[in-house]
């Protein structure tokens, strides 16, 4: 399989983490992260023109990171490759629904708030974005308490992360870069002790070590995005 994506893209990391956890060999086809879309990307994802895109061996394409992760899980289950301790989604229908719900929350609420911290046009907007990020993390702290059953990961297991772990874990490099750039503490032992422990366990997992980009690389990319955002403000 091949993945159209970017090394520092958190959504690409989410798809790659799922492939890595499932032991699926793939090739990362690097796409430039900018306003100009390649013909290859537009052909693979003509609806949104966004990464990541999972290119199947037969030429078909699957878009959107959360959809890609669930596709990988569905294939593993149908082929008999999903064992009880390595499921990305729980067997229980209610728990599956809850994991999907919180994945949507991360994408719709947490990530836009975190992204706005670094790209906010004014100090006031940045302070509001940081407050929104902390509010989202507070809710995710409670979600971890409810979903993990006292275990290491959101998945409810100690050995392997699941869908919800990948959904939040793919943003850890961006979160740490944001903290470093702006002198913030967003996930820490005082405000979110459960997430603090989880973040350390997730970052130490072999799949995360293989896939997640170095924080400094994300810092440099974020600075590039900040310059772009400032330029757009000046020319608008």
From Swiss-Prot:
EC number: 2.5.1.18
Binding-site positions, glutathione: 9, 37, 51, 64-65
Xref: Pfam families: GST_C_2, GST_N_2
Gene Ontology, cellular component aspect: cytoplasm
Catalysed reactions, semicolon-separated: RX + glutathione = an S-substituted glutathione + a halide anion + H(+)
InterPro entries registered for this protein in UniProt: Glutathione-S-Trfase_C-like (IPR010987), Glutathione-S-Trfase_C_sf (IPR036282), Glutathione_S-Trfase (IPR040079), Glutathione_S-Trfase_N (IPR004045), GST_C_Tau (IPR045074), Omega/Tau-like (IPR045073), Thioredoxin-like_sf (IPR036249)
SUPFAM superfamilies: GST C-terminal domain-like (SSF47616), Thioredoxin-like (SSF52833)
Domain GST C-terminal stretches: 92-221
The keyword Transcription regulation is assigned to this record: no
Membrane-crossing residue ranges in chain numbering: none
Alphabetized GO MF terms: glutathione transferase activity
Pathway the protein takes part in: Pigment biosynthesis; anthocyanin biosynthesis
Coiled-coil regions, chain positions: none
UniProt KW ATP-binding keyword: no
Membership in a protein family: Belongs to the GST superfamily. HSP26 family.
Identification of the protein by name: Probable glutathione S-transferase BZ2
Source organism (scientific name): Zea mays
Gene (UniProt): BZ2
């Amino acid at each position: 399989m091949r993945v159209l994506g970017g090394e520092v893209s958190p959504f690409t990391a989410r798809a790659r983490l799922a492939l890595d956890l499932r032991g699926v060999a793939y090739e990362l086809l690097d796409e430039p992260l900018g306003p100009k879309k390649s013909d290859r990307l537009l052909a693979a994802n003509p609806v949104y023109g966004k990464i990541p895109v999972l290119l199947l061996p037969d030429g078909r394409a699957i878009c959107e990171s959360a959809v890609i992760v669930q596709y990988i899980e569905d294939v593993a289950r149908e082929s008999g490759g999903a064992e009880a301790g390595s499921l990305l989604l729980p067997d229980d229908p209610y728990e599956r629904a809850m994991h999907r719900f919180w994945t949507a929350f991360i994408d719709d609420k947490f990530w836009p708030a975190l992204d706005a911290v670094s790209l906010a046009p004014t100090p006031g907007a940045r302070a509001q974005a940081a407050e929104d990020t902390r509010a989202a993390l507070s809710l995710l702290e409670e979600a971890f308490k409810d979903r993990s059953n006292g275990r290491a990961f959101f998945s409810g297991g100690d050995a392997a992360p699941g869908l919800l772990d990948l959904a939040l874990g793919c943003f850890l490099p961006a979160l740490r870069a944001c903290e470093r750039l702006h002198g913030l503490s967003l996930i820490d032992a005082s405000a979110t002790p459960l997430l603090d422990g989880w973040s350390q366990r997730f970052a130490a997992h072999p799949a995360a070590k293989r896939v997640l980009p170095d924080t400094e690389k994300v810092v440099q990319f974020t600075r590039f995005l900040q310059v772009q955002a400032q330029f757009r403000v000046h020319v608008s």
